[in-house]
A protein has these predicted regions:
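Flexible interhelical linker loops that connect adjacent transmembrane helices
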Residues: 170-195
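Glycine-rich segments within core transmembrane alpha-helices of 12-TM secondary carriers
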Residues: 46-51, 124-150
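Helix-loop boundary and gating motifs at the non-cytosolic
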Residues: 2-51
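C-terminal ends and interior cores of transmembrane alpha-helices
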Residues: 57, 75-92
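Symmetry-related core transmembrane helices of the 12-TM Major Facilitator Superfamily/SLC fold
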Residues: 154-174
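Helix-to-loop junctions at the C-terminal end of transmembrane segments
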Residues: 51-71
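Hydrophobic core of transmembrane alpha-helices in multi-pass small-molecule transporters
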Residues: 93-115
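Cytoplasmic helix-loop-helix junction between adjacent transmembrane helices
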Residues: 109-133
Length: 196
């Protein structure tokens, strides 16, 4: 179909998800911790870098499948680095660390978004509904954790990107949700993606 990628996913879908993830990160993580003028700079920088990462990784992910795992690992490293910067005691007073954390999160999230959405290209309706339901549930849980216990969040920020990368690594490139024994079902994929 015209305007679609090699896997059948329209480009505007993952562009939209990237914008959503960037907005969510900025609202939940930076909205209450930075001054308005600094938050504006971080917001703009993260948005630009996220879109640039999507454009840069688009041909790599959809046309050179052998690099998917490398891309997932690189994105995970960026997200873990972002979590480390956010959890650092120095980040309380260092604007540069906040900016670096936002940029690392923007790039890592953008790449993982593209990777996950590429898995949805050939899933059936039941798999997609399971994925969507668990995505919403995981989003709700993460929001609750952020609001009720923000001091504990760095623990989740370190663990969840690694989990997501491991699940991407174990997935065959030609199947969005493997059904073979021992492979995680669509529910696990929805929950894993929902935390980003």
């Amino acid at each position: 179909m015209r305007g679609e990628s090699a896997t059948g996913v329209r480009p505007y879908i993952f562009l939209g998800f990237s914008l959503y993830e960037t907005w969510k990160y900025l609202v939940l993580f930076l909205g209450s911790s930075l001054a308005h003028q600094v938050n504006y700079v971080v917001s703009l920088s993260t948005l630009v870098v996220s879109l640039a990462a999507l454009l840069a990784f688009y041909p790599v992910i959809f046309r050179e499948q052998s690099r998917i795992r490398l891309s997932a690992i690189a994105a995970t490293v960026l997200l873990v680095a972002s979590a480390a910067l956010t959890a650092s005691p120095l980040a309380e007073d260092a604007i540069a660390l906040h900016v670096a954390s936002g940029l690392a999160s923007g790039i890592g999230t953008a790449v993982l978004d593209v990777l996950w959405i590429s898995r949805l290209a050939s899933c059936n309706q039941r798999q997609f509904l399971l994925f969507a339901a668990c995505f919403i549930a995981a989003q709700s849980l993460l929001t609750y954790l952020l609001v009720s216990a923000p001091s504990d969040f760095p623990i989740y920020a370190f663990a969840l990107p690694v989990l997501s990368c491991a699940m991407l690594w174990s997935t065959p490139e030609h199947k969005p949700f493997p059904t073979a024994p021992g492979k995680p079902p669509a529910t696990w994929y929805g929950a894993a993606w929902g935390v980003f």
